[in-house]
Structure formats: C-alpha cells, structure tokens
Amino acid sequence: MYIHERDNWTSFRWDTANLTAILEEVNRKQGMLYGRLSSLGFDSKVKAMAENITYDIVYSSEIEGIRLNMDEVRSSVARKLGIENVKCTAPSHYVDSVVAVMLEAVGNYNLQLTKEKLCAWQAAFFPAGFSDGCKIETGQYRTNEEHIVSGMFGRERIHYIAPWPERIESEMNKFIDWFNHDESCSSVIRSAIAHLWFVSIHPFEDGNGRLARILSDIILARGDKSEFRFYNISSQINKDKNHYYNILEKTQHGDGDITEWISWYASTLSLALDEAETTVSTILNKSMFWQKASSIALNQRQTDMLNLFLDGYEAKITSKTWASLAKCSKDTAIRDIQDLIR
C-alpha cells in the first residue's frame, strides 16, 4: 500500500523527542551562519547568494540526470542579480528559464503559492514540451497515470504509483492551502513535509523533484525571513542520491509516520549548512584581504590571479602556470609575479 492510499494520508505524524537534537543542531548552525553573514557587505552577500543558487540549480537538475553547464548557470544568475566582473558564458534559453524560476521563487518567498505559478514554473523546465525526447504535458497537471520505475526494459521495478489523475486537483488544492497558511511547526519540519507531500502527489508529468526542492527552499526562506539564500539541500542530496531515493521510497510505503524522513532531511540540511559555512569563510577572508590590499596598485591580471588563489586554487604557481591562466606571455607573467613579491 502506498502512503496516499491511506485514509487521511496527509495527517503526517512524527516523534518530536527523536528529532529534538538534530533540529536544535540545524537551528544553531542557521543562527551562526546568518551571524557571520551580518559582517559581510551587501555586494559580498549577493555574490555569496549567486554562488549558492548556481549550485542549487545545477545539482537539483543533476539529481534528475540533467547536466547543466555550471558556467552558463553562473553567468545567467550573475546577470539577473546585476553582478559584474563575472566570466561571461552565454547561457542557453533553457538555462535562463530555469534560473528565472529559482530567482522568482526565492525572491518572492512571502507571496502566496498558486496553481498558476506552479504550472508556469513546470513549463519553464520544458520550453519545447519534451523530456528525454518524448512529448509531455507542460503547464498543467498531468492527465495520465504516473509510475516511478527503474531498471532495463522488460525488467523494470515499480517504486511508486502516484495518485490517479482524477485526484490531483483536490490533492493539490489541499497542499497549496497548507503551504500558504500552516505554521504549526518549525520551518525545517514544514520544508521536509512540503518536499515529501509534493513528490507523493506527483502532480506533473515531469519536473516534480525539482519543484519539490524549490518549494522546500521557499519554506526555509520564510523561516529565515530572507530572500538571500546561502545554503541549499540539493548539493548534499546529489552526493548521495541512492539514500535520498531509498528513504523517499520507504516513507511513501509507510503508514504516515515520517520521523525518519524528517531526521534524514534535517541531517542533510545540517551538512548543507556546514558547506555554506566554508563558503562564507572564504568570502570573509577574501573581503578582509582586499580591504588590507586596497592601497596597493595592481593590474587586472594580478587581481584576477589573486582572486583565483583566494577562491581556493592550490596548485604551485610558476611563470608558466601564470601565463596560461592569465593568458599572457611568460615574460609578462614573470614581471607580474616579481612585482607582487616586491
């Protein structure tokens, strides 16, 4: 029996006592992260958010087996946020559409969710109306049965069968009403529930996983009361996709007790916050370095190369390496390096 076949299936239950420790850990890390971010200037915050959103978009797509060009996504995000001096890689129309969805969603986290908005976001993921070469329904709830399967043709394994199409409208009305109005538990728990609930309805023919993660981000943004997003769960899920799909399948075959799902979700979020802390530390160190070096006259090549090292480049630098990275002659590279040493 699948979870949606049970009576009152969305009356989810969880053991608060078993979740207290991990939820407190997540709350503490959220507080520490935003505390450190308070010392960053506005421009640095925007750049940090741009990098986080880039990773979120790329890895959320990769979870579904869709590979996006990181430089294209980064360039599109930077342009839409008004960030200058970013390596320009012309993004495709598709990448621009996906980036626009994410920025609209988290930038307007306090606005009401609607069916029309969800349908528009899903359509943006499939501008040509195809997925894996097959024509699909876009911009509307699905009208066909949906089976989640894996394996080779003839040896498929069914992991989950979503609710019948006739139920989707009423199921989604209930979900959207809950999403817009329920504040009975913490934002972390609501974020975990939103993810599970949405993918269990599976309202669209494709794109449900990515939409579920966007909806989770919106609830976290509401909890943080900030459109600035500095951490994302997609990067961590992508590192262990098998665990993600296993815990999701187990919960969708369960009896409505989602304690294990929330625990996994919060633990994954905790790891995401650790990664964000590392990113913010890099940005803070970089900011402090340039404050101290503000009186030193540097050419653009030197500035670019120093930024490269401040961003974590660890290879030993030689005049040959410098010339290659800075796209200059070896003699020019030698002068640049000697000038910095002096």
Region annotations inferred by a language model:
Residues 1-342:
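FIC/Doc superfamily catalytic core
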